[in-house]
Design a protein with these regions (language model features):
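Extended helical coiled-coil dimerization/tether regions that scaffold
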Residues: 1-105, 109-132
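Alpha-helical scaffold elements adjacent to nucleotide-binding pockets in ATP/GTP-utilizing enzyme cores
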Residues: 5, 47, 106-109, 146-150, ...
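Generic amphipathic alpha-helical segments used as scaffolds and interaction surfaces in large
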Residues: 14, 31-42, 134-138, 320, ...
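Generic recognition of stable, solvent-exposed alpha-helical segments in well-folded globular domains
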Residues: 39, 43, 100-102, 142, ...
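Short beta-alpha junctions and helix-cap segments that line functional grooves
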Residues: 67, 162-164, 329
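Short, well-ordered loop/turn elements at secondary-structure boundaries
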Residues: 77, 100-101, 125, 153-155, ...
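Switch/communication elements of ASCE P-loop NTPase nucleotide-binding domains
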Residues: 82-256, 260, 264, 268-272, ...
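Acidic, Mg2+-coordinating catalytic modules of nucleic-acid enzymes
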Residues: 207-289, 293-463
Length: 463
């Protein structure tokens, strides 16, 4: 009620003359009822009425007591928002509630004020602008998500800064502006689904290319504007470079932005993952990407053994395989300039992952240094290259080892024996990952027990 916005809102109150007179009479009647219902107040009025004997005032009803403001506008000036949370019979003014409740009330007040104000505007193009700094402060997660819905319903331009993954988890990622410091300079990045650039003289080759790939490239010869509507690949990059002749710097910028375009499927995959992870990945300083849940369980423990901590280092782990593919995350990291390291299996699927990263426009040098392949086919087999971890494998699946598997070991067929043990572990990957952690809690690994590829990945994001 002390907010300037509240005062502006109250000034918008409009009551007709007839209704105002009726209210005025009701208020006067209420005031008179209050006075006459109490003997002490009546006696006080009678005593004060004697003032005319001293001051020589003329007329009747010289003295009265205003128990309530007698003017409607005086009454409105004392209006305030009161809230009862339902647990008591008391109504408390909004300024006696917590910061979170006050913030929500202020935003909803703005919502109502904007609606009234815009209805009074004669220009159809009139639009309000709402700027909010960390509206999630002092609110629990469910309240933050509910607040986001209320803000989203406000019909105006909204500029909001937030540090809450809960606030952004249901937003359209294309509305996101990602702000970060880079070498002392503030950088702002965004996700886009097309890239538009102008060319002073559109080459014939580009026009022919747009005819052949109309789903990707659109040319407006009248405005000399080229629109790339879908992410390009290496082949299309070569074709664009071949038919355009601006400076190398200009064409490089065009190609770089064309690789950063997100198609609808990629945006849907990212939206789904952000909702699952509560948007946490967008606040991380670095990403460690891996294929499955087993890595999600075990890699933080490996980091601890190496004297590192993912949370302290600002690292978010991302399971890319169960959320579409690696490509959208590699592209998002490029768009937002988030450093990353990716782990991939050394199999056909792993090679497919490398191809997805390559199609995001990364150089071969970046791919070879940031996409780390297991020396074996997958995570469980890679862990089995460590003698200590393989021994632990045997311990956690001991009840499932059959006589046939034991005979493989006794006959000296070590490779086949290891394969069978790994298969048993893989039958319950996640459960067995937790069994390993439980085992290691009493008998910790050493850094030498961790396969080299995971040491390199962890140090790559934590240093």
């Amino acid at each position: 009620s002390k907010s300037p916005l509240w005062g502006r809102f109250m000034k918008k109150v409009s009551i007709s003359k007839e209704d105002l007179e009726e209210l005025q009479n009701q208020i006067s009647g209420l005031n008179n009822d209050i006075i006459t219902k109490d003997e002490n107040l009546k006696e006080l009025v009678n005593e004060l009425d004697k003032i005319q004997n001293v001051m020589d005032f003329q007329g009747e009803d010289i003295v009265s007591i205003d128990a309530v403001p007698l003017k409607t506008w005086d009454l409105l000036s004392k209006a305030q928002v009161v809230i009862n949370n339902g647990s008591t019979s008391y109504n408390f003014p909004i300024d006696k509630h917590g910061q979170g409740t006050q913030s929500v009330a202020a935003i909803l007040l703005f919502k109502a004020y904007v609606k009234i104000l815009l209805n009074e505007m004669s220009r159809e193009e009139a639009e309000a602008i709402l700027t909010l700094e960390e509206p999630e402060a002092h609110l629990h997660p469910q309240a933050v998500r509910s607040l986001h819905k209320s803000i989203d319903e406000i019909e105006c331009q909204k500029i909001i800064t937030t540090h809450s993954p809960y606030f952004i988890q249901n937003m359209d990622l294309k509305n996101l502006r990602y702000v970060r410091k880079e070498n002392g300079e503030t950088k702002i990045a965004k996700i886009f689904d097309r890239y538009v650039f102008s060319v002073s003289d559109i080459p014939e080759g580009l026009i022919r290319l747009s005819s052949r790939f109309s789903n990707v490239i659109e040319v407006d010869g009248n405005l000399n504007i080229v629109t790339i509507k879908d992410p390009i690949n290496r082949c299309l990059e070569g074709a664009i470079r071949g038919c355009c002749h601006p400076s190398d710097e200009t064409i490089d910028a065009v190609i770089d932005n064309a690789y950063r375009i997100f198609n609808m499927a990629e945006i849907c995959n990212l939206n789904t993952y952000v909702q699952r992870s509560r948007g946490e990945i967008l606040f991380a300083r670095k990403w460690l990407l891996y294929e499955g849940q087993s890595e999600d369980v075990i890699l933080p423990y490996f980091a601890k053994i190496l004297g590192k901590d993912f949370d302290a280092s600002g690292v978010s782990g991302i399971i890319y395989r169960s959320n579409g593919s690696a490509g959208p995350f590699a592209k998002l990291a490029k768009v937002l300039s988030i450093p990353w390291v990716m782990l991939a299996d050394n199999d056909e699927q792993g090679r497919q992952t490398v191809g997805e990263v390559r199609n995001c426009g990364y150089s071969e040098d970046v791919i070879s240094s940031q996409v780390l392949l297991n020396s074996t086919t997958d995570f469980e087999n890679e862990l089995a290259t460590s003698n200590r971890i393989f021994t632990d494998y045997e311990s956690i699946v001991v009840e499932e080892i059959t006589q046939d598997i034991i005979e493989l070991k006794n006959s000296g067929d070590v490779d086949e024996y290891k394969k069978e043990i790994v298969k048993l572990v893989q039958k319950g990957k996640v459960v067995n990952a937790y069994k390993l952690l439980d085992l290691w809690s009493g008998n910790a690994l050493s850094a030498d027990d961790i396969p080299e590829v995971y040491v390199n990945a962890i140090l790559g994001v934590c240093e």
